[in-house]
């Protein structure tokens, strides 16, 4: 079974220092796994989703690629608008990502009883995840997981 490591910035790391935070983590774990995932989409780390913006995502993906020899995937949120999704996919592709992981959990709890903070997965997310997968497949030739 291939072992992958999902990387995310520390909760105390400022957004402007995120690329270096990912690089440090990459250097520590890259030799232990078969692939890495740039996770910029978890709703549970304050500010993490802002890293899906092209200005951050390009540097983060490039830093992870530069500090490892294993394939690097980028994991995106299902809550991105189509334009944001397109920008993120384009940047990930240009930065050398091996594929896109679509999607992480959603922060959209519309129509669901109050379940508290954090991401939601499962059946309520399935329709949107399928929409994102279809959209990403039209945007890139990269594999989609």
Where are the regions a protein language model picked out?
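P-loop/Walker A phosphate-binding loop and immediately adjacent motor/lid segment at beta-alpha junctions
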Residues: 1, 51-76, 115-130
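Active-site beta->alpha loop and helix N-cap motifs at the rims of alpha/beta catalytic domains
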Residues: 1-37, 42
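Active-site beta-loop-alpha junctions enriched in small/polar residues
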Residues: 6-12, 41-43, 75-79, 103-107
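Generic structural signal for well-ordered alpha-helices
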Residues: 22-30, 54-65, 85, 89-90, ...
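A structural motif
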Residues: 33-35, 69, 97, 141
């Amino acid at each position: 079974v291939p072992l992958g490591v999902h990387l995310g910035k520390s909760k105390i790391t400022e957004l402007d220092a995120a690329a270096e935070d990912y690089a440090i983590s990459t250097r520590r774990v890259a030799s232990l796994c078969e692939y890495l995932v740039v996770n910029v989409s978890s709703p549970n780390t304050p500010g993490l989703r802002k890293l899906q913006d092209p200005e951050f995502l390009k540097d983060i993906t490039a830093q992870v690629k530069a500090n490892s020899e294993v394939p690097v995937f980028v994991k995106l949120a299902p809550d991105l608008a189509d334009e944001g999704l397109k920008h993120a996919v384009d940047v990930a592709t240009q930065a050398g990502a091996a594929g896109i992981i679509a999607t992480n959990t959603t922060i959209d709890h519309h129509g669901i009883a109050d379940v508290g903070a954090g991401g939601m997965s499962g059946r309520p997310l399935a329709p949107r995840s399928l929409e994102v997968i279809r959209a990403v497949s039209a945007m890139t030739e990269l594999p989609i997981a």
